[in-house]
């Protein structure tokens, strides 16, 4: 079972400030396949504040730097493709091949299109 209870805010994995947890049920087995946090207003406010604070420096990032970051992201994303396909398969109850092609692999295509803009 995947245990995903933290949020990635301002460059770090942080525990929720408010909110609750929710079980994710695999519809093919009706078993809990993950436990996730449901953030509250304070969590949203913290994420938005971090994004606003990052905007100034990010807006000064060159196209070449952004492309390099996207390429690194794509490398990591593709290295975890099977893991993502498995998680998607569990949360949707979909066959693994469908989860891989319709969900996990489509992210690679979207990222490649951004790299080539």
Residue ranges with predicted function:
Residues 1-115:
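N-terminal Rossmann-like NAD(P)+-binding subdomain of aldehyde/semialdehyde dehydrogenases
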């Amino acid at each position: 079972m995947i245990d995903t209870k933290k949020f990635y805010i301002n460059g770090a994995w942080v525990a929720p400030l408010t909110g609750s947890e929710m079980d994710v049920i695999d519809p093919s087995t009706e078993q809990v396949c993950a436990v996730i946090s449901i953030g509250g207003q304070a969590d949203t406010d913290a994420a938005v504040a971090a994004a606003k604070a990052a905007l100034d420096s990010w807006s000064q990032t060159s196209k070449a730097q952004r492309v390099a970051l996207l390429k690194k992201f794509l490398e990591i994303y593709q290295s975890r493709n099977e893991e993502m396909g498995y998680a998607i398969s569990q949360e949707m109850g979909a066959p693994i091949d469908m989860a891989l092609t319709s969900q996990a692999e489509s992210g690679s295509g979207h990222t490649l299109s951004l790299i080539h803009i």
